[in-house]
Amino acid sequence: MAIRKYKPTTPGRRGASVADFVEVTRSTPEKSLVRPLHSKGGRNNAGRITVRHQGGGHKRAYRIVDFRRHDKDGVPAKVAHIEYDPNRSARIALLHYADGEKRYILAPRNLQQGDRVENGPGADIKPGNNLALRNIPVGTTIHAIELRPGGGAKFARSAGASVQLLAKEGAYAHLRMPSGEIRLVNVRCRATIGEVGNAEQSNINWGKAGRKRWLGVRPTVRGVVMNPVDHPHGGGEGRTSGGRHPVSPWGKPTGRTRSNKKASNKYIVRRRTKNKKR
């Protein structure tokens, strides 16, 4: 993809940019793979806000994406279309399997309409193919990685994300995550070759607040401009710095949320890099 910039015809257009969608080959999704999606506006079943800054936005339909693929080992597929998905930053690819079934997968970089995709231990090492980590050579760039065997892809699913397979020792593989963290993952877990496409997504300049509202993102108000009743940083005469280390509206310190007693800490070889530029 590429980024298309607008001329400054209005204040909202000044500096704004959009994706050119040149890789998208079809505008309507596969009807059998679409389900209704009801907007919650950040509310739970009691009607209380549990996730702030959510609400509104354009109505969406959910595309069912296959994050497992293990039941299609040995069945070749052809890429029928590359499509836009409003529910994620990556594009999705519609596969037509040789047995007649249709499924969506995340579209890797350089995957094109008409390409052949395979799953299982006999698959070639090329973008879009899905294999177990034990069958992938060291140094390969991968994405859509399972955390537990058969559990479905959990890591590296957003646009431009990729993980590097550093080593394999016994039952575990060493993976370098996009954050810089090095983590152990069982070699029976599956991953897809290549990196997720649409990497330029992070370079889009939204231009105006309204475009974020179309996506269902509501404003984020700083605590220092609130009243004391609303936030620990609120109040004071004139502009203030908050007077303390940053905290949440409920007084919890920001950052450093991972517990030292978390059971999965033993699978982290090296913690993620601090202040990593994104």
Swiss-Prot record:
Region described as Disordered: 29-55, 225-278
Pfam families (alphabetical): Ribosomal_L2, Ribosomal_L2_C
A GO biological-process term: cytoplasmic translation
Molecular function GO labels: rRNA binding; structural constituent of ribosome; transferase activity
Composition bias type Basic residues, residue spans: 258-278
Entry keyword set: Ribonucleoprotein, Ribosomal protein, RNA-binding, rRNA-binding
A Gene Ontology term for the protein's cellular component: large ribosomal subunit
Regions that span the bilayer: none
Description of post-translational modifications: The N-terminus is blocked.
Entries under Gene3D superfamilies matching the protein: 2.30.30.30, Nucleic acid-binding proteins, Ribosomal protein L2, domain 3
Protein function: One of the primary rRNA binding proteins. Required for association of the 30S and 50S subunits to form the 70S ribosome, for tRNA binding and peptide bond formation. It has been suggested to have peptidyltransferase activity; this is somewhat controversial. Makes several contacts with the 16S rRNA in the 70S ribosome.
Family of the protein in this entry: Belongs to the universal ribosomal protein uL2 family.
PANTHER family per UniProt: LARGE RIBOSOMAL SUBUNIT PROTEIN UL2M, RIBOSOMAL PROTEIN L2
Subunit note: Part of the 50S ribosomal subunit. Forms a bridge to the 30S subunit in the 70S ribosome.
Protein's recorded name: Large ribosomal subunit protein uL2
Gene: rplB
